[in-house]
Curated annotation (Swiss-Prot):
Disulfide pattern: none
Species the sequence originates in: Equus caballus (Horse)
Induction (record text): Upon cytokine stimulation.
Residue numbers spanned by region Disordered: 73-110
Biased composition regions of type Basic and acidic residues, renumbered to the chain: 93-110
Post-translational modification: This protein is the precursor of amyloid protein A, which is formed by the removal of residues from the C-terminal end.
Gene designation: SAA1
Protein name as annotated: Serum amyloid A protein
One Pfam short name: SAA
GO CC, alphabetical: high-density lipoprotein particle
Domain of life: Eukaryota
Keywords of this entry: Acute phase, Amyloid, HDL
PROSITE patterns per the UniProt record, alphabetical: SAA
Tissue and organ distribution: Expressed by the liver; secreted in plasma.
Illness the protein is tied to: Reactive, secondary amyloidosis is characterized by the extracellular accumulation in various tissues of the SAA protein. These deposits are highly insoluble and resistant to proteolysis; they disrupt tissue structure and compromise function.
Length: 110
């Protein structure tokens, strides 16, 4: 149990780091890369990290879907992007290389 909790805590920090990097980079077309990278890094921590990544990713997407109803009037315009985000999340969590989503020109520091 302690190792699971430690993995979950470190995985949470991996997700926070990816989010902060995404905000700092502010690079068009890079969001899927940062989604995949955060999930990939967290899942590498072990089952606790993978669990934390899924909980955080699902909560973020559910919150975004909720707020999109007010932003887009329930038009569903955000639904396609949310599905693409979830696919990138799962890609990373499953251990696949997040660089698959890396846009050309994104600075090497990320």
């Amino acid at each position: 149990l302690l190792s699971f909790l430690g993995e979950a805590a470190r995985g949470t920090w991996d997700m926070i780091r990816a989010y902060n990097d995404m905000r700092e980079a502010n690079y068009i077309g890079a969001d899927k890369y940062f989604h995949a990278r955060g999930n990939y890094d967290a899942a590498k921590r072990g089952p606790g990290g993978a669990w934390a990544a899924k909980v955080i990713s699902d909560a973020r997407e559910n919150f975004q879907r909720f707020t999109d109803r007010f932003s887009f009037g329930g038009s569903g315009r955000g639904a396609e992007d949310s599905r693409a985000d979830q696919a990138a999340n799962e890609w990373g969590r499953s251990g696949k290389d997040p660089n698959h989503f890396r846009p050309h020109g994104l600075p090497d520091k990320y």
